[in-house]
A protein has these predicted regions:
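Cytosolic, long alpha-helical scaffolding segments
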Residues: 1-222
């Protein structure tokens, strides 16, 4: 049986989540985080540029993310059930992985939701101010995902504090965009779609916060 984790005698609680994964598992974890980051950036660009083909490619990319998540969930569950020689630290890493994967999958889903609206041409119907706010939300969303990736992939726990602050900016932008929607500068159907869009970006930030908290909690005291 292929081992996802080595059989070390001493637990290593401070290691990054994927630091001890073997070569069959680590690339998949790294790839998932990269795909989600690309999906969010691509969805925002497609929305603002009106590139419907790019939007459709982001939607298709979500299928790859879902497939990778399912593959890792199955592998992690198999290890927990069949590999009796895992030490405590490795078991905790696997359990943490099983907890963060749904957050990652949902983050990819949010990028897909944005891309679907881009494919329908929502971007061209936005007011200038709402467009500027959406552009900034996209930039902040990409930044917070990079920070979350650093925490999970590289174990840079110091980035967790920055994630909380970045999420606060996303929350503020969400409030600002919601206020803009009540100004009457856009039709009601467009305003409704933009309200959903703002919520998608805000929820994306929340998932990043949850990812960081799970990693920090894993390395914290029991």
């Amino acid at each position: 049986m292929n081992r996802l984790f080595g059989n070390r005698s001493e637990p290593d609680e401070e290691a990054p989540l994927v630091a001890t994964a073997d070569e069959a598992m680590r690339p998949q974890i790294v790839q998932i985080f990269a795909l989600v980051g690309e999906a969010m950036a691509g969805a925002t660009h497609a929305l603002l540029s009106g590139d419907r083909e790019l939007a459709k490619s982001v939607v298709d990319k979500d299928k790859a993310i879902d497939a990778l998540v399912n593959s890792l969930v199955n592998a992690a569950e198999l290890q927990l059930v069949e590999n009796e020689s895992l030490n405590i630290a490795d078991r905790r890493r696997l359990l943490t992985l099983l907890r963060i994967l749904p957050e990652v999958e949902r983050s990819g889903d949010l990028a897909e939701h944005i891309a679907r609206r881009a494919a329908r041409g929502l971007g061209v119907e936005m007011s200038p101010r709402s467009r500027g706010l959406v552009e900034r939300m996209g930039e902040v969303a990409s930044t917070i995902w990079r920070e979350a990736t650093d925490v999970i992939i590289d174990g840079k726990l110091e980035a967790a504090g920055a994630i909380e602050e970045i999420d606060d900016e996303l929350d503020d932008l969400h409030v600002s965009l919601t206020a803009e929607l009540t100004s009457g500068s856009m039709t009601l159907p467009v305003a409704v779609e933009l309200a959903l869009l703002a919520r998608f970006y805000e929820r994306f930030g929340d998932h990043c916060v949850n990812l960081a908290r799970r990693q920090v909690g894993r390395n914290g005291p029991d």
